[in-house]
């Protein structure tokens, strides 16, 4: 598997994977997610892909250049903030591997690629949010050595 930057030609396949992720969340939290939808429109994806400095997206592709998985990154930095230091963070907005390709270490390779990208580009850390309705994702990130940074809680009224 090769890992490269996402391109506009990958959008149809990325959409399929975005729908898979959304459906996991919709099954776990139908009060918050609409089944069958996805996080981004074509226009939004084109804009994200074009902004290589602020939103790096990496795709893992097979020998036929078929996208097997992706990892969306967002560069975050609090410059001249009153109480936060100016560290540069790479936030993983989304990481997905096609459900038909799981258990082949694709997610691990994408995650490690993102860690290396962050190290090589002067980032302080890599962060992400994981939904409690997705215990498989939580277990994966725990296995990768990620540690809780903060806890986001809710009370449903």
Task: Identify the residue ranges that each predicted region occupies.
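A short beta-loop-alpha structural element at the N-terminal edge
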Residues: 2-16
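Conserved GNAT acetyl-CoA-binding A-motif
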Residues: 118-129
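A short helix-loop-beta-strand connector motif used in the catalytic cores of GNAT acetyltransferases and
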Residues: 43-59
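Conserved GNAT-fold acetyl-CoA-binding loop/helix
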Residues: 23-46
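Conserved active-site alpha-helix within GNAT-family acetyltransferase domains
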Residues: 108, 120, 132-150
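Conserved beta-strand-loop-alpha-helix junction that forms the acyl-donor binding cleft
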Residues: 127-137, 154-157
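Conserved acetyl-CoA-binding loop-helix of GNAT-fold acetyltransferases
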Residues: 94-97, 103-116, 143
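Conserved beta-strand in the GNAT
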Residues: 59, 66-75, 91, 96
